[in-house]
Regions:
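Class I S-adenosyl-L-methionine-dependent methyltransferase catalytic core
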Residues: 1-175
Length: 175
């Protein structure tokens, strides 16, 4: 929607056909624009429909491995993977992002950490390292406070010996 309102071309990718349908419906509004918006079902491990060095900005919000599953059995859905498998797939995402991004342009990734067996697993920083290993440089690390999380009420009522994870990172990388 923002790309259409700002008269910018955009490509939107999601693995879940329901999300694609929602996006297509949300784009049905009228405004004065010449933008071209392409919504495609798929995942970002294979962007073969985009030529090298054609994208000015990438913004992504991947799942946090298998913490919340976005489908039951969609092939290629990385929300169904273990942390190790997720990071392997994110390595492919980082490679493809690097390939399609123009030199000097930015890629923003919003992701947070997770908790496993009472310990914090720094998934955000692991994903950051994946992108750095693929050649990106770190431009900014933004800490975004989370509000109204689905599980906050549940965890606040439990007898815990740990703090709630109440933030996400927005890592801004430059090619």
């Amino acid at each position: 929607m923002e790309a259409k309102l700002l008269n910018r071309n955009a490509v939107g990718i999601d693995i879940n056909p329901q999300s694609i349908s929602i996006s297509e419906k949300n784009l049905q509004f009228q405004c004065e624009t010449t933008s071209k918006i392409r919504i495609q079902q798929g995942n970002s491990t294979n962007l073969n429909f985009v030529k090298d060095g054609r994208i000015d900005f990438i913004c992504m919000h991947p799942p946090y491995a298998n913490i919340i599953k976005y489908s039951k059995d969609i092939l290629g859905d990385i929300s169904l993977l273990s942390v190790e498998e997720f990071l392997c797939e994110m390595s492919k995402v980082a490679s493809e992002s690097y390939r399609v991004l123009k030199k000097g342009k930015m890629c923003a990734v919003m992701i947070g950490d997770i908790r496993r067996r009472g310990k914090v697993l720094p998934l955000g920083f692991q994903v950051m390292n994946v992108f750095l290993e693929k050649g990106f440089s770190s431009k900014e690390i933004i800490i975004k406070e989370q509000h109204n999380c689905r599980s906050t009420d549940y965890w606040e009522k439990q007898n815990n010996d740990f703090l709630l994870l109440s933030h996400e990172y927005i890592f801004v990388f430059q090619k």
